[in-house]
Amino acid sequence: ADISPRQVTDIDQVLDMWNGVIRSNYKVDGKPVSVLTSCHPDRDMVSAEINTSLKLPVAFRFPYPTGAHADDACDWSCDSLHATRIVSSGENNVMLSHTLDDTSYYISVSWEGDVIPSMTGRNEFRLTPLSDSWSFTAEFSPLDTGVYEANALEVRSEASRYWDYFWRSGGVVDFSECTDPRAQELERRVVLSQYLLAVQCAGSTPPQETGLTYNSWFGKFHLEMIWWHQAQFALYGHDNLLARTLPWYESVLPLAREIAHRQGFDGVRWMKMTDPSGVEAPSKVGSFLIWQQPHIIYLAELLHRANPNGAVIEKYADQVEET
């Protein structure tokens, strides 16, 4: 909607970490707006439940990448270099495709309530509600797999189920017996960091240094940093989250062997700065750094201690020995 920041007042936004929902309440021109935002724990899907008499539309804007070292990665000035279109549509859903250069990805959007969908620009899609209360879900996919129709309440329920299990199954810090006046704030920050790391650093590849919040190092990740982001999962009793990422090492094993061979070594030399493909990023020094080398040994050992069985040894033996 075409609203200036000055029109938005009385902002009250709370992250409920136990249920995985953000509760937002604010006013636009003095009229109240409430929004519940959740993320599906098993799919690349976000949901929003909106209630306001203003019937505010929601816009989906798609940027071109900046290619910069560190920024939000969004270039809004190159509209002609990419295109967004509606691939298919149903009674309460659409499938959008966004194509930039040789890359295409898809966004499945579903909604509940009386809503008008429309393309409002070359790279902008809008949902305009006709009722005070409505909701929508949006799911990212690298392929057109069809619309997965999940309503917002289902997403919020799945998020609540996941986070309830997360907090009950793992460890947390408790500084309630500490006499230092800083203890309560330190405990809050440590627990919040557990949530943030689980949200941003437990994917199918090692995370970039800024997680998902910001774009750093051209969006690439650095293997020397995976220990800092993910070792704590196993120590807090969430070894399953660490186990999500480590299979990536196996997928790039042939490339790591090539690096070692090129440099005159046996075994593997893990890439320092890379991306999901495992290809080394250009660098004057990166290829010769070794601080990323021992991490797979340490992290595999953490998984073995959490699950002391032959399956873990068999899964990671080659990577550990070749490292």
Feature map (PLM): residue ranges:
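Acidic/polar, glycine-enriched structural segments that form the non-catalytic walls/loops
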Residues: 1-220, 239, 249-257
